């Protein structure tokens, strides 16, 4: 609203310009008063001595630099309030509290440093609001909360930076029964001069993810797994130098993880949990001394060894995975010995017994269970050839295909996104790879430099599909899958403290908090907390 428009509006509000002489002391200096209307210009401070029947107040070129909370408590009858050509460093929260009858608020052609998100609180009768031409680059989120009676909002003439700070405004506009004038964006350059109300909120990326260090678990570890038992999340670490499988739980009073139980397992490489109702199994795959199955039949008992697993077959285990076949739980143990073979162990009565030997003489380093085309599949990585994909047919695994252009792959992990299945293939030196299943085979999608990598682990944490590429020589890298691009994008480095020879990652959610465990072979296990940051706030 220009100066002429303001003047006409005030004359109309005054009603035929009827002269009125206010009681002595009721019209402050620098002000012109009528019975129901006042215009003040150039006053060094906010006037207070007004008639209790005052309906409209206009403040022009004031010397006030700050509108404080409760600035208008002595003017409860105001229906219209106008500011123009002023300079405010800040408009504080509750600046207009007490103006429950105010219908028109025009704050126009001013220079405003900042506005509190609670500045307009209490204006329950407000119908017309103008913040036009105030040099504002953004508005605080929730500024209009509680203004249910608004019918007209004018935000034009402000140099809005149309980044994440305006996302809340774009999401708010369709939800109100008010006409909103927004004007054009002043920046960033990609959207400069585009009308703000023409922007698509869905194209804004205003969530940030951060993994911050929380805790250290002293001993080194080769693997880490999460599982839920009796409704409580647990973690189990394979600690070969300590000779144990260490089970951790969350201490709600100390707000950190603490040991709950440990299983004696010298030279252990993997501790794989399986929960069947009240019963808990832990498979301890060991390099020497025989792999064992531990069991707890009820929550009030401790885990005890119940079975030595296939002592003639499991010669040098390197990895163990859990999978379900025809409704029964099975373990697959990848064997890295020269004369060994990967073994499938399935439940039969009280224990787990060999069901099938796979991939003899290939020195397998990793096994990954996955589902493709609605059927169980098994992917084996080995030191001697490209990864081989098996599928479950007629009660056994049969070779289906291998992974092209994937030599020297140490480990494989998979994830799903947007209905597609992706592989993360770990190579120690060179390029680790991301591949996508096309219905008949996996095809190369992306390559990421590896510098001493033994693990390339995908993890779904909250809404973030992450993948962590470990490194023995540098900081481990965290990537996030961007669904619109279909690739992994760098997110952050893990550290400090730096991970020393990371070998496995796992995530767990406890009491609404999300944690990432990093098992390290030459250093302590590190625990990080996952945070979601709203950049539009």
Swiss-Prot record:
Any matching Pfam family: EPTP
Subcellular location: Secreted
Highest taxon, organism lineage: Eukaryota
One BP term from GO: glial cell development
Signal peptide segment: 1-19
Keyword Signal: yes
Domain spans labelled LRRCT: 158-208
Coiled coil segments of this chain: none
LRR-type repeats, residues: 53-74, 77-98, 101-122, 125-146
Main location: secreted
GO cellular component assignments: extracellular space
Keyword tags: Glycoprotein, Leucine-rich repeat, Repeat, Secreted, Signal
Membrane-spanning parts: none
Tissue-level expression: Brain. Expressed in the entire developing peripheral nerves. Strongly expressed in the trigeminal nerve and ganglion and particularly abundant in the boundary cap cells - a transient population of cells that contributes to the Schwann cell population of the dorsal root nerve.
Sugar-modified residues: 177
Disease affiliated with this protein: Defects in Lgi4 are the cause of the claw paw (clp) phenotype. Mice are characterized by limb posture abnormalities and peripheral hypomyelination, with no sign of dysmyelination in the CNS.
Complexes and interactors: Can bind to ADAM11, ADAM22 and ADAM23.
Protein function: Component of Schwann cell signaling pathway(s) that controls axon segregation and myelin formation.
Protein name per the record: Leucine-rich repeat LGI family member 4
């Amino acid at each position: 609203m220009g100066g002429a428009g303001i003047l006409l509006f005030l004359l109309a509000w005054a009603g035929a310009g009827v002269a009125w002489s206010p009681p002595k002391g009721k019209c402050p200096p620098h002000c012109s008063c009528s019975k129901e209307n006042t215009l003040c210009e150039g006053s060094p401070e906010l006037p207070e001595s007004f008639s209790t029947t005052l309906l409209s107040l206009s403040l022009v070129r004031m010397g006030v630099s700050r509108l404080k909370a409760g600035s208008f408590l002595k003017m409860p009858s105001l229906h219209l309030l106008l500011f123009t050509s002023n300079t405010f460093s800040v408009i504080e929260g509750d600046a207009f509290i007490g103006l429950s009858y105010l219908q028109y608020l025009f704050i126009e052609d001013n220079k405003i440093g900042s506005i509190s998100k609670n500045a307009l609180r209490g204006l329950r009768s407000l119908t017309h609001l103008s913040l036009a031409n105030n040099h504002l680059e953004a508005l605080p989120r929730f500024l209009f909360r509680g203004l249910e009676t608004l019918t007209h909002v004018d935000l034009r003439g402000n140099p809005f930076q149309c980044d994440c700070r305006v996302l809340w405004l774009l999401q708010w506009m369709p939800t109100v029964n008010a006409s909103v004038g927004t004007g054009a964006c002043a920046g960033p350059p990609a959207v400069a001069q585009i009308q703000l109300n023409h922007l698509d909120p869905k194209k804004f990326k205003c969530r940030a993810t951060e993994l911050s260090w929380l805790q250290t678990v002293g001993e080194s570890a080769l693997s880490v797994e999460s599982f839920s038992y009796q409704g409580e999340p647990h973690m189990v670490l394979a600690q070969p130098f300590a000779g144990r499988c260490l089970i951790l739980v969350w201490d709600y009073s100390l707000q950190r993880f603490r040991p709950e139980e440990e299983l004696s397992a010298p030279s252990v490489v993997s501790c794989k949990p399986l929960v069947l109702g009240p019963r808990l199994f832990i498979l301890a795959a060991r390099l020497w001394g025989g792999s064992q199955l531990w069991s707890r039949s009820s929550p009030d008992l401790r885990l005890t060894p119940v079975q030595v697993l296939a002592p003639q077959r499991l010669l040098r285990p390197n990895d163990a995975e859990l999978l379900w076949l025809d409704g029964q739980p099975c373990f697959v143990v990848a064997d890295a010995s020269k004369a060994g073979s990967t073994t499938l162990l399935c439940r039969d009565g009280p224990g787990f017994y060999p069901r099938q030997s796979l991939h003899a003489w290939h020195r397998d380093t990793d096994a990954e269970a996955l589902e493709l085309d609605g059927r169980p599949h098994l992917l084996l990585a080995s030191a001697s050839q490209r990864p081989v994909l098996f599928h479950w047919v007629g009660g056994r695994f049969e070779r289906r295909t291998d992974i092209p252009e994937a030599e020297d792959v140490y480990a494989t992990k998979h994830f799903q996104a947007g209905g597609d299945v992706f592989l993360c293939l770990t190579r120690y030196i060179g390029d680790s790879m991301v591949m996508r299943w096309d219905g008949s085979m996996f095809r190369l999608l992306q390559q990421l430099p590896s510098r001493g990598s033994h693990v390339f682990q995908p993890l779904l944490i909250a809404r973030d599909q992450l993948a962590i590429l470990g490194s023995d020589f540098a900081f481990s890298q965290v990537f996030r899958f961007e669904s619109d691009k279909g690739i992994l994008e760098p997110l952050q480095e893990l550290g400090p403290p730096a991970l020393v020879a990371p070998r496995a990652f796992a995530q767990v959610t406890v009491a609404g908090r999300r944690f990432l465990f990093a098992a390290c072979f030459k250093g302590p296990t590190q625990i990080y907390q996952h945070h979601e940051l709203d950049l539009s706030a």
